[in-house]
């Protein structure tokens, strides 16, 4: 025997603190069990846990309740001390001994599998106490996996053994709780003679006359000590009264639960209670020595073995000396060269045993192996997780929209680092705090606090990008929109690209949302098509899945304040369960509902004084906050495989409930502490290793104190295992900075924690406004708990990773906690050798492209250390690509920035790529430019290219041709390369190049091959197999070598046509080998003839070039090989082509209908290569056109030149390789061109060879083309709840039409009705009426008077005031807001003013909602052409809101004045200003109220003074409005910053027009506005009106559309005037579209004039009167009363109506409905399809399916139906 092994199992868990040492041991086993290298350990622990749970279920209720819940058997280590006080303590310790010993044994041998080579002949097992059970498991199992299979039975034995011992011992001595409470059952006595001790015990028992069951007994001696067992009272008497033992050194073993090894109390009946029947497959395999007899146990089965062991453990005295003696004798007899004592843990027995062996066997080498230490030293993380549930979760991307302008993670960090508190009064776009807040709490349904923390501009959204129509966008909850946006940004941050790595079918979304404010309040004011899908919570994550085409689950989670952290946990759980491979998760909260404020305020949740004062003595509740955030999660191993940036790693997550709290909303510190311990166990970490806890910390007294208590008790306990002084616990909460985001609170905390890891700084806690809350634990400093009032550095430890916990409490009682570990740095393991990189930028719109370019250039220039390779990799392989594109080739980031910068200016004029598939032709080169080392760099670096080359070379060698690899690698001299090898190398490299391009996503639409290149072309087209192509090329070349004499014939390239050559060449014989272009011909013949011909042609002025080739290909010289070539290749099989082949042999295109066989290729060897003729035929046939892109497969671009010169309109012809140029540089140039041409490229495959050298960088996110989609909450109906406020005047029910009511703008009231809180007015005015002459003629456009939009505004003011005066009590005063005004078709005054030119006005008021819908109808055209909504509001609240902007506006006015003084801005007089304005509008003196104008590009101010006389009877004179507001139009039409020579700008709409005080005659005002670009050639601005230094009026979001000046005559021409020619603008053609200002909506029916009944009264005595009645089926929505958009001229009526209908329903400009416009891109979905299909059926009589619009692709498809 060369080596003997003795395995020793002791009888206990390692000594020491059970909550320290033991936890560390079991924690290590837990972590190892999660790794793929330890499957048997994982199986073993699962089996032991399962068996333990089964045994637990068998217990009686009283005992079941003693055992705490556990997920793994290892969790019970946390409860050892407590369990010792119960009847289960001993049983649990026995099971933990088993789990520790066998777990360590298995882990060690899984790490060192070769060491598990135990044989019965050289291995002995010895053990003591419960260690015998562990030894039995090993003895019964010849292989390691079998230990796991028997472990369930061994676990049951261990547990039952403990139960029996406890049961028996309690029957001997009463012990109500801890079995050892009265004293120890075992004493260890040192330094006594065993025999004398035995005799002393015997005498003592006899003297005391104990019953046998109460006697003491010696059950073990090991030479150094004696163990005595017995009831505690007996042993206490023994050691206090017995003279022999009083003087001994003895130790009571109080940790040992009970006694055994005594036949006085145990018998076979106890053995039978313990031992289950075990499957007979387990037989004794290794010798196991009895600690009683000292001999190997003999057993016929596992059951037999365990019964023997248990009988000895219960009833027999241990004789360890016998065991040692017999084992030693066995070893001596075997005489091994060495012995190894394998012990689970160090012990005195191991040392004594080794010492004895060394004395008895001095010539033998003796070693020991401490498995426990070896296991503790095993590295973690060296292998992948064994399964999904064992994985760590990587956070790979994040994005946010948080309060205080924190629109991305970096801005969020700046806010935290600066210690900012961003709470503010509730913005007016949410609701009016003047009416909805009552600090006294007396007004019903109001909030007591006006504060919150709010996201900037929550309505901003890029609807077109996300395929949503403007209508759908407006009706969709902004928090769901922002969830979609942040999901995109987080995915972009993570480098996710569809089709790369994670499959879309394996991605899910999980979002927390706990309110529906927008649906309940904002969109609920006017329920539309998208009320449900736009507002219900399930659609939030569902819309994300739908947009990105994710197939995984989408969950909306509501657990109140912990919703988003619970959603993150749900996402992690889905990853752990294997349901998904990637999750996008987060939370959302946008506040608009005053009811929630009122409810929380009345429920005493909210602070009445402002922000969250967490841990402050004055904490008085929380401050509400907006917030939307998204993170991207993957299993760690997947993230590493995908080369992602890992921001942090989730180790464990869990949720429990504060079910025992005093109320449902009250936290419970015990439940919270239980949760923290649970996640720590799952994570396999020591809670004291956690360095930072991001707490819930809302600033409520109950919540803060309970959470602090639970956190400190677990992570910084005051007793027992406490924190080291150099390891403080920092705590913080984001809520002190930006409030409580409620459903978004968890994602705010989570993102903050990611940033804390990233920055290595814990930002200051700013919640302490006065002093620390005295309710917090007094010993925080002693516990080493730090609340950082200033920023604290969180030092990275080299030997362990930093750990943090994020904690959330939900108001409904849920607690969610997540343990996060910092990400380990990942070194680069290779090098990117490419000299130049392709930098790509793209967008869906020109504006976004420009902004993307600006942001990127700024980003690059600010980071000199940036790697250009990382930049290229991020922007190409890890970003999505769109149709507006820019790409540059750069060798450095500085060069990249300089090349990108010029594109910023040109990007707005860029034409997008259509998205249609561009035809790509692969052209395969001949042999004329051969060189050594073709594709050398690709072969070296690209696995894909190398794979194909190696496969092809393998085929070459198997056909008995020489390898061509030396030609590729460059390891050969040119003269040593045969024709055969050269030809094979050329063709095989071309095939490999084609396959490489295909891996890049570039696949050929057609192929053409030149000469030798035809073989590669046919292989790529599927005609020839690779093997057949190699065989044909090799055979042909071999025949050429053997049958054709080299260098007797040659080839001559001539820059002339064949006809010119024939004419100039005289009688010199030659053959035309190749026709490469119109004036490019290759000739063949004898060398002498070629030399003569060269001289002759040169003399004639033609350029010639002799080709360095050994033969004259495609001439009669080839005749010598044709017959033999036919014979040798007749078995070659040719298939039908899969793509068109442009054939130079036949000079035509060949398709799958053409037959190609070997004769084709043999003929091609001999016959002329008519490359130019083939190209010409392809062009004539339409296969090739201007858009075709040519990609040359070959070692040098020769065909590219032929193609460009033959087809002069060729778009581009690009090379794959180029002589004397690095392969990667050539590829990069070509890819750059392809990308710019709109070709989809698989950049991941391009970068794959170097990916381990590349890193994803945090480049700027996509720049959105945002527009504000926001439905404003109007009025105060949330307060009234059906109770009208103010009360309606009860006397006003039905009002007869007043004959006396007439103003300058409203000439006649047709009808006026007031019923049930509603009012309906119909009125009429005539544009030709003398009362309007001044304001209409004084506002002339194109030379004609126009009823301006401001005149229509005056009408709205007048009718609204009429309704108010008649409906409300006289004491009530309102401000009138003319809002959502849209003016779709101008009203131009007729030339013949003798005829009336009426317009009808309808006003419908909802007096409870305090709003009036006003519409204008043009009877002459039978269209509703204008509409607005008037709101009655409190002007004092306007003034209050505007006052916050006063400083900003006045500062801009002051700046403009200063610029005028210095000449930087233009100051214009009245005459000059209106003269410039005259380019578009001819203003009469009545209108010329601007006294001076200061103009600076897009910004202006005007000093305005009104005349003393209003010139009529007005509510708000239209020329007064014009004098203030037309400054916005002057910037565009009168200045020089905008092109108003070729264009003009007119306003179709504004969002709101409000004047808080009357515009007084003679009054002096200041107007200020800045106009900024919006969508689709439009501009928008807010006009501020100041009286003195106070803002008294605002026109918000006034919109101007840009139109070509040639349209002016079309827009502004009276109906009774024929069209006059418009002035032509050079380079401009007149559009064929009938103009309309803005996309708008349809009137299903024209209005009807219905006679009034006599009893309704009439204003005119000569008329029965009329009212404008609502048409049948008319919706009260004002959109339905508008005119259809106008389609292009020249269409049939149905087509015009259909396109107008589509534009109306999608709320898009009809100009966007071009033939190739994609329906889906315009925002169409299934709901909109139903609506439009129904309308086409009803209004046009078309028979179409509901799904019609989902089945068509473009507008052209719709037109095809209508033709």
UniProtKB/Swiss-Prot annotation:
Positions of region (N-terminal hotdog fold): 1307-1439
Null mutant phenotype: Impairs the production of alternariol.
Region (C-terminal hotdog fold): 1461-1609
Active site annotation, chain numbering: 561 (for beta-ketoacyl synthase activity), 696 (for beta-ketoacyl synthase activity), 740 (for beta-ketoacyl synthase activity), 1339 (proton acceptor), 1522 (proton donor)
Segments of this protein annotated with the region Malonyl-CoA:ACP transacylase (MAT) domain: 922-1227
EC number: 2.3.1.-
GO molecular function, one term: 3-oxoacyl-[acyl-carrier-protein] synthase activity
Ranges for region Product template (PT) domain: 1334-1588
Region (Disordered): 1619-1690
Coiled coil: none
Domain named Carrier: residues: 1689-1763
UniProt remark on domains: Multidomain protein; including a starter unit:ACP transacylase (SAT) that selects the starter unit; a ketosynthase (KS) that catalyzes repeated decarboxylative condensation to elongate the polyketide backbone; a malonyl-CoA:ACP transacylase (MAT) that selects and transfers the extender unit malonyl-CoA; a product template (PT) domain that controls the immediate cyclization regioselectivity of the reactive polyketide backbone; and an acyl-carrier protein (ACP) that serves as the tether of the growing and completed polyketide via its phosphopantetheinyl arm.
Stated role: Non-reducing polyketide synthase that mediates the biosynthesis of alternariol (AOH), a micotoxin that seems not to be involved in virulence and oxidative stress tolerance. PKS19 alone is sufficient for AOH synthesis which is initiated by priming with acetyl-CoA, followed by sequential condensations of 6 malonyl-CoA units.
Protein name, per record: Non-reducing polyketide synthase PKS19
Species of origin: Phaeosphaeria nodorum (strain SN15 / ATCC MYA-4574 / FGSC 10173) (Glume blotch fungus)
